[in-house]
Swiss-Prot record:
This is RutC family protein PM1466. GO terms for cellular component: cytosol. GO terms for molecular function: deaminase activity. It comes from Pasteurella multocida (strain Pm70). NCBIfam families: Rid family detoxifying hydrolase. Coiled coil: none annotated. Belongs to the RutC family. InterPro entries: RidA, RidA_CS, RutC-like_sf, YjgF/YER057c/UK114.
Amino acid sequence: MTKVIHTDNAPAAIGPYVQAVDLGNMLLTSGQIPVNPKTGEVPADIVAQARQSLENVKAIVEQAGLQVANIVKTTVFVKDLNDFAAVNAEYERFFKENNHPSFPARSCVEVARLPKDVGIEIEAIAVKA
């Protein structure tokens, strides 16, 4: 049975979708853009945007009763692949700080545009151990 996951600690959906769905043994998040859920603001630089998107993913994963360590796959959408190294560095910091046993599998794709003209969006798949 599918369960909808919602938390006020991540931005509300800006379209006809939910923050995540829990399939019982697997959690699928919608893409998280770097909107601070408390202020509605978007950080200016790509490193802070990457961190905010990851923190939003974390909030959703934790609302489902899981941890960052349960994330097995992410998809990262960036507006500019020239930001790849900066995003990678923050991504690595985030997963190390959150005690991920390795790193999740990942795809990274450059896209023409993202909602609210942000520089990054991240979605994740997490599994229950």
